[in-house]
Amino acid sequence: MAQMDNIFADRIAQIRGLGYDAVIISGTDPHGSEYFAPRWKQVEWASGFTGEAGDLVVTQDHAGLWTDTRFFIQANQQLAGTGIELHKTRVPEEVLIPRWLAGHFQTKPVRVAFDGLCQSVGAVRELDDTLRGAYGIGGYDLIDRPDLLSSLWADRPEIPHSPVEWLDEKTTGEARKDKLAWLRSEMKQRGCDSMFLTSLDEIAWLLNVRGSDIAYNPYIISFLLVTPLNAIWFVRNVSEVPDAPGIICADYGVLEDALEDRREECGRLFIDPSTLNYHTYKLIRKFFAESEIVFGESPVVLRKAIKNKKEIEGFRRAFIEDGAALETFLYWLETSVKGGTHVTEWEASEKMTSLRSQIEGFRGNSFENISAYGANAALPHYCTQRENSPVIKPRGLYLIDTGGQFTFGTTDTTRTVPLGRCSRLEREDYTLVLKGMIDLTLAVFPGGTAGCQIDALARRPLWATRRNFGHGTGHGIGFYLGVHEGPQSIRQNFNPQPMLPGMITSNEPGIYREGKHGVRHENVLLCREEGKSEFGTFLSFETLTCCHIDTSILIKKLLNKAELDWVKAYNRVVYRLLKNRLAPEVAKWLKKKCR
């Protein structure tokens, strides 16, 4: 460990050697992605931190990592001995990077360097405004250095390029030409002629195309320019891309030439500053005056979040088939561990993936399995390692958070299960987290209600006993796309986006006790119309997840009748849907679990 700490200390020293007052290293890629290819894992290369969300700032006298509540424990462990300080976000006392930089320097001018390929236009504008307020015009200099770390990172990976998979209307429920026609109509309504798209999930949805350039996410690294006449897809290895009607393929590296050649065709251009990287924006500005660019949230974000009939059918199928694999896994785990078989967290994770991979249409996991026993489950995004993986023992709690990518849908399920004797505290936490999940599941609410307005339903049982969790309660899920998508969310942070029929969102409260245990229950919900009255339209949720809830350690007096009835009814449905999909011994086991 000391040797690894020295590696990261050396890398921080190399970054300081670039000669800037501050260097910002962002945890994203040129497309604003949450998950990205190894080439852009710059924060991990420089610091050793492997969490999905984190930004690094290196000054001549300080190195700091900014990350949120999901990763505090992990960051403390991985940063130990590196000299890098943890800066906590999504807490009341947070000081984000722009404000921290604005208060850190005593002398001017301040030279701040960043990789403009991995900083959004919106982020750079916020940074510019904040530093101007602190140091005044001329008191600072923002320096865009594309691929800033390449001179230091000798074996930096190349940009990947995987085979292209075009999907047809039978799979997606809507043809590519119809999606493009809709987008062009949207642009007209916004006073624009064209749109430049950078977000990989939006491009994948719009073009009905998938790939595997990024682990767990079926994307092709690319840009897309949609004009009134054409859709130009900028992608690597153009010669290997199968033809698709209505799509012109161009090389990923000739974006500047294409913008110049098609300037007149584009007219007024719409871009989303939250995902467009700053360096690409500068290229666009070479050919478009500021008055010829319209900023706004991409209309694709909301449109793809509202699933069509075919997509909803696919999700239902995915959760049933994945549920059968998960039940088979839980049967194997319980019988193996209680039977004295040596099973590690890694082996359990591999077993889950092996069972899921037997499903027709499987394209990979939708994220890295979280296979966590005991105290390891207190890290919400814990990932076990093949070497020295902890042994799962026949006592306490085990947590599995797992999902799959299928051509007909994407899944994400968490189950915490007892493997033997559990403490009173474990049983209380288990029951109260389940109580919160059920209370949100049973919600009926008026149309126009945002996720932040119903988040407290999942937290109320925890708050009542002075418990809480730091992450959001729910995130959107894409259709054979990313397991995390917006615009909706269920979390305490303000998000005005209403929940709408057709949205598919997770419901995953939890409790995490460092050094002891972690509990999370997660089902995925389909928002639907419940009915109408003189007070308007009301909405509710349908549960898509199909995996039983273990009731053996519930403290039933902590649940009311409606909650107990829900558990019984849910488990009955799970058994009915899965019994004929399971091996006889697994079906027999599940029947007992669902009583």
Residue ranges and their predicted role:
Residues 1-595:
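Active-site neighborhoods and metal-handling regions in enzymes and metal-associated proteins
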